[in-house]
Amino acid sequence: KRRASQHVLWGGDQRAADGGIDVRLDAPKGAGIDAGFPRDIIGYQVKAMPMRPSDIQNEMCPNGVLRPSIRTIIQSKGAYIIASADSTSDKMYHGSISAMCNAASSEIGVSESKFDFYDSRRIADWTNENPGVVAWVREKIGRPLQGWRPFENWAVSNAGEPNSFINDTAPRITDPTNSNADNYYSLVDGLQEVRTILRRGGTSVRIAGLSGVGKTRFAQALFEEASAEHSLDATLAVYTDISFEPIPSPQALLDELLANNRRAILHVDNGSSELHRLL
């Protein structure tokens, strides 16, 4: 599903004063639900320490008064979610939910809102379901997969600076598998054609061309809304260049993803036609 990332606000040290919200989703009606979120309006509070029921009460109601930020979420029939680095049992999880509901029980409309608690195990499980996020997390904690990278600026200039995607209306791309006479595309039309193919799943696309014409930049633009609307989900993207000598190999990583029924979009740069055939 499409991610509503343009409607997400976050920033700052999670230990800093934040009014009870570290990350906020404020999506138009239906956009959050369509993107896989429980509600269109969500407030996330992130805690590095364990959160007992008494801690939850104090967090949501400092000095015995419900935080205005949480009250606003309830009035919008949204969701309030606490994410903790601690690991909890099933009994502790339900105790945490009860504590959250009790803390907000005096607010009108609380029964139409949603409260949830994410512990470290639940966060890890979600991360493992999204290969692009796995690559990003491992990179951030200093344990990257050799040669594999999450979505980022894969294509850089000779000076090491990011390149903007440059589009024009001239035909730049051709599809040799299309027997129709009209098989030439502008860059944006080509992006949309490749996106459509990749969304089907269980398929592959080989981008061929002379060195330096922008093949990697084109592949990066597949995941960029700024390059063309209706981009692919960047959290699914996992990138490598064969010159990085990736471990695991592209074939091994693909086998693992298939065995675990995990959805991902692998981009293998500078791969041979034989490797493409194998994949």
Residue ranges and their predicted role:
Residues 185-199:
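Pre-Walker A adenine-sensing motif
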Residues 200-219:
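Walker A/P-loop nucleotide-binding motif
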Residues 236-247, 253-279:
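Conserved P-loop NTPase "ATPase switch" module shared by AAA+ and STAND
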Residues 3, 224-236:
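Post-Walker A helix-loop "phosphate-sensing" segment adjacent to the P-loop in P-loop NTPases
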Residues 49-54, 85-94, 211-214, 242-248, ...:
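Short acidic, S/G/P-rich loop/turn micro-motifs used as interaction or catalytic elements
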Residues 1-175, 179, 208:
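Mixed-charge (Asp/Glu-Lys/Arg
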Residues 91-98, 128-129, 216-221, 250, ...:
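A short acidic (Asp/Glu
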Residues 42, 75-85, 204-205, 234-240, ...:
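Hydrophobic beta-strand segments of well-ordered beta-sheets in folded domains
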